[in-house]
Amino acid sequence: ITPQRLLATHLELVVSSSELHLYTAKENNEYFLIIDCLTRIDLSIFEEKCFSVLLALGLISGNLALNEFFILSFSEEKMSAPLDLMYQTKPSSIYTHQAVFTTNISSISHGMGLSQEEKDRLGVGLTEFPKGVFSELATQLHQHEKLRRATKLLLLGKNASMEMRLPAYYVAIEAITGHVEAKDNLLKPIRDESVAEKLIKSMKELIEVEKKLHSNDDFNSSVLLRKINNLNRPTNKDKLSQPFSFVNYSLSKEEYRILKDRNLYLHGSFTKGKDDNRYRDALHTSTRLSFLVTVLLLKLAGFEGKIINYAKLWSGAIGKNLNEDLILSI
């Protein structure tokens, strides 16, 4: 996959049990992404799977190709003459030009002052994006609405104003958290639900006994009962960090703090003013959040490798002196 130009070499992939081929074609100096299904498939399902493939490619390349679709149907596997043609207008493509993955260090290191030795070191282990992981990523996006939503929020956020970008990234992480929470009891303080129910029941019984000994003003049992009913639910701050444990990614102290700062940005409290330092701090935070959303989406698909560290790439413009590599292993 070559995300820098929104192109792909011919790629065979499997999305939710359907074998698809992804490749490019050029006509009148325009490039088209082509997706073929080699077996009979329902039109609506084909459209869903095609969008999932485009969304997966958009995550990796930073550019989501939409605008317009041409759908051709065929009666035979050779696809020599189409039976029907359908044209669809789509929302505008999203071009962020912020790929998360590269095989060419030189393509992102211009102006960074890296020596050839440093480039060679960073390039160790860089290979093409694994085909199996791409298939799994597209499959996950096809099967799970929360992951599709998170990916779209990530891409839309990259082009949004800072007031919209930061909340979009936090909501993306919340969507992924909801997906992980539905899969696993990892996010609950008490893993065994029967143990939690037993504890909650005993606490409620104790409250019923105690409230008979106190006035309503001195002992507000209704408030206590509401809190006890939520006993086995982590706080929003804690919830956002748990999916990273699920994918075996260790958060740095700064990343953990940024997740804790959710409420500072989620409700649009950040507005651009005259304080350039405040804006630069927010921009730096956005690069960290974008990285974290990417980590979750890729690692849920089984990716192990290196991705671009935009906090470092943009550190000069932001005014941060970061002792970090331009690409990081996840």
Where are the model-predicted features located?
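Charged, low-complexity, helix/coiled-coil-prone segments
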Residues: I1, T102-K119, K198-K204, V223-D238
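Short charge-dense sequence patches
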Residues: I1-L6, S115-L126, L206-H214, N232-S245
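Charged, non-catalytic interaction/linker regions at domain boundaries
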Residues: I1-R149, L156-S161, Y279-D325
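Short, well-structured alpha-helical interface segments that form or flank functional binding sites
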Residues: E48, R149, S161-V171, S250-K260, ...
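Generic structural signal for bulky hydrophobic/aromatic residues embedded
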Residues: A56, A175-I176, Y265-G268
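Active-site-adjacent bridging/hinge elements
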Residues: T139-T151, L259-S269
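Amphipathic alpha-helical interface elements
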Residues: Q143-R233, I308-A317
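Polyanionic, low-complexity intrinsically disordered segments
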Residues: K211-I330
